[in-house]
UniProtKB/Swiss-Prot annotation:
Binding site for pyruvate: 44, 206
Catalytic residues identified in the record: 132, 161
Family the UniProt entry places it in: Belongs to the DapA family.
A single Gene Ontology CC term: cytosol
Known function: Catalyzes the condensation of (S)-aspartate-beta-semialdehyde [(S)-ASA] and pyruvate to 4-hydroxy-tetrahydrodipicolinate (HTPA).
Protein name: 4-hydroxy-tetrahydrodipicolinate synthase
CDD domains cross-referenced by the UniProt entry: DHDPS
Pathway: Amino-acid biosynthesis; L-lysine biosynthesis via DAP pathway; (S)-tetrahydrodipicolinate from L-aspartate: step 3/4
Domain of life: Bacteria
GO molecular function: 4-hydroxy-tetrahydrodipicolinate synthase activity
Chief localisation class: cytoplasm
Length: 294
């Protein structure tokens, strides 16, 4: 589907409504700086608080702006398999290139339940499916063995966004899934683990940081793929303060604040999320200035 950087793009709001004008500006910023894919309505896109009509508007506008230049992957996960399938079919109808399907949260399925969830969906769509493993938010963890089973059996499940920060799990997930199917892709779901995942044989990152610093995140991956390990490590180290600052509060609170400081969007979220504290705002101002982004 893609190698490199897929930006998990924010959803801008203004006076409680979608701000498509600011959104277009942000999408073009991503395209101009060479990102390899856009992930719309993921965690960073505040998908739980975006309604069905808004989803359609946002996905349709994204596809219009991107115009086939890079893949557009749409977040379509819920904790109901049937509701998830409904969102997948909506994305398919609109012309998305793939769907990001988070593991069912709150109801805590077993490993067999996780496998059956993805099997059910994969049998009912032709879209490429990306498994999204983020145990810190969902309460369930896709074990490397389960990821490998999915890779072996479900051919239109194209990869996994691995947001478990455990380095050992990252390594095992990459190793076992690639053994099961050589074209199965593994992307980091944590910006600060991107370099480590690449070293383990992974394929890139679905990134929050690239909302703000797309050029730098693209460079991190591109240098690695070109064999310039030291340069990639250097970019990673330079980005560390920004990576840390953008997770000073719950994502996407800091990244929206940063984009506001950069003049891209209003600093507006939907409840239960609230804007960043002044302490975080000051941290972001300083880090953005030090990074040459402000």
């Amino acid at each position: 589907m893609f190698r490199g950087v897929g930006t998990a793009i924010v959803t801008p709001f203004k006076n409680g409504e979608l701000d498509l004008e600011s959104y277009e500006r942000l999408v073009r910023y991503q395209l101009e700086n060479g990102v390899n894919a856009l992930i719309v309505l993921g965690t960073t896109g505040e998908s739980p608080t975006v309604n069905e009509d808004e989803r359609e508007k946002l996905v349709s506008r994204t596809l219009e702006i991107v115009d086939g230049k890079i893949p557009v992957i749409v977040g379509a996960g819920t904790n109901s398999t049937e509701k998830t399938l409904k969102l997948v079919k909506q994305a398919e109808k609109l012309g998305a290139n793939g769907v990001l399907v988070v593991t069912p949260y709150y109801n805590k399925p077993t490993q067999e339940g996780l496998y059956q969830h993805y099997k059910y969906i994969s049998e009912r769509t032709d879209l490429g499916i990306v498994v999204y493993n983020v145990p810190g938010r969902t309460g369930v963890n896709v074990l490397p063995e389960t990821a490998a089973r999915i890779a072996a059996d479900l051919k239109n499940v194209v990869g996994i966004k691995e947001a478990n920060p455990d380095i050992d799990q990252i390594d095992r997930t990459v190793s076992l899934t690639k053994q099961a199917r050589s074209d199965f892709m593994v992307w980091s779901g944590n910006d600060d683990r991107t370099f480590y995942l690449l070293c383990a044989g992974g394929d890139g990152v679905i990134s929050v940081v690239s909302n703000v610093a797309p050029k730098q995140m693209v460079e991190l991956c591109a240098e690695y793929f070109s064999g310039n390990l030291e340069k990639s490590r250097e970019v990673h180290r330079k980005l560390r303060p920004l990576m840390k600052a953008l997770f000073a509060e719950t994502n996407p609170i800091p990244v929206k604040a940063a984009l506001n400081l950069m003049g891209f969007i209003e600093n507006e979220l939907r409840l239960p999320l609230v804007p960043a504290s002044e302490k975080t705002m000051e941290l972001l101002r300083n880090v953005l200035k030090e990074s040459g982004l402000l």
